[in-house]
Amino acid sequence: MWDLLVRGGRVVDPASGLDAVADVAVRDGRIAEVRPHERGAGLAAEDAAEVADAAGRLVTPGLVDLHTHVWHGATYWGLDPDPIAWRTGVTTWVDAGSAGAYSMDGLRRFAAELARVRVHALINVSALGLVAETGEHHNLDNLDVDTAVAVAARHGGFVRGVKARIDARTVGRHGLEPLRRAAALARRLDRPLMVHVGYGPPTIADIAPLLAEGDILTHCASGCPTDLVADGRLTAPARRALDAGAVFDLGHGSGALAFDVLEAELAEGVRPVASSDLHARSVHGPAFDLPTVMAKLVAAGAGLPEAIAAATVRPARALGLDAGTLAPGAAADIAVFDAEEGRFPVVDVHGSVRESPVRLTNTATYVDGRLLPPCAAEPPPPWIPLSGSQRRAEEDRVGATRSAVRRLESPEDFDEPFPRAGS
Ligand SMILES: [Zn+2]
């Protein structure tokens, strides 16, 4: 007997090499069996307590977003993941440096443990984390490696790596010293280092020599660094980082996706992780959510299965997470989408437009085999500027949420008696 059977969808699970019409059975919060239809009949509906018909839909592992900011109510960038997860299929959220040593305990207790989704963290090398818009490295007293090691040790597997924003504004006059300390911290924890790149200095040529195999270069398709891609080719330092085993991660955010850079990287053989860098300033656009970022990756030339790999198995492996697959025994984190085919315009942060041949609209999201309930987001905090169209979209969303509540008041609503307690 199964608790849930997701039947007849196109199941794409790159970790298992599966792309076929199949049934997915769940028992005790775990994937119990996945049976492709070509191997005979599907799984029997009678054997399941609940059956979800996914015919004509796309079924993937719950998506894994490698770069997000979920320390809401405590930082400049933070947002609550649950109001976004249920409508996007993202079941694993990696918070990228919102908390440093001083607030890791708070991120865990007041954001991660209260969320319905899975949350992991990268510890910021600055003990201040991302409480403010920038400047966390301006006072090096806050970048104490011993303190960060001690805090990370208390949090075991919750802390999956280290984060450092390395751009001119964030490092101030300290140049590469914040990066050196972040690298030292990552080596001592034996975990990957995620480096945010932007307007330098430091440049990619400065940063790349400090990256080790498995470290993550986030904002990899940003138009901001001047020496990431040149004349449609990876620059020598970017090529060196790639060849040394650095993971290239999109980290779309509010300013880090340029189609010309991404297209050059794909042509050069980069297979990036698709992450949203979702935060209070990117959730209303231009990133919106991870399925939108995946559609942009497809628009830039990657196939849909490749985009799914970039948002499931690849980010999971980058941090050694037990997520991103529908293999039997895995946690039953499942995303179901309407994968509409057509020509859908998508835009990068510089206003360049491409057409995606697919648009992903999430129709159901399960964590541990349980359907995430719809849930409305809080209004954006006062320091987040919204454009006129972003404000109107926000008002529409609030209005639609209110009008979703229907009273039972027409005569047909009373054609049978309401159930009474005890009857
Ligand atoms: Zn970020």
Model-flagged regions — what are they?
Residues 9, 24, 29, 56, ...:
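Divalent metal-coordination and catalytic microenvironments
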Residues 260-340:
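His/Asp/Glu-enriched, well-ordered alpha-helical/loop segment
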Residues 83-166:
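Divalent-metal coordination cores built from histidine and acidic residues
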Residues 164-264, 268-284:
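Active-site core of metal-dependent hydrolases
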Residues 1-44:
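N-terminal metal-binding scaffold of metallo-dependent hydrolase/deaminase domains
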Residues 39-60:
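Active-site metal-binding motif and surrounding structural segment of the metallo-beta-lactamase
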Residues 331-383:
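C-terminal cap of metal-dependent C-N hydrolases
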Residues 54-113, 408-417:
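Metal-associated gating/positioning segment near the N- to mid-region
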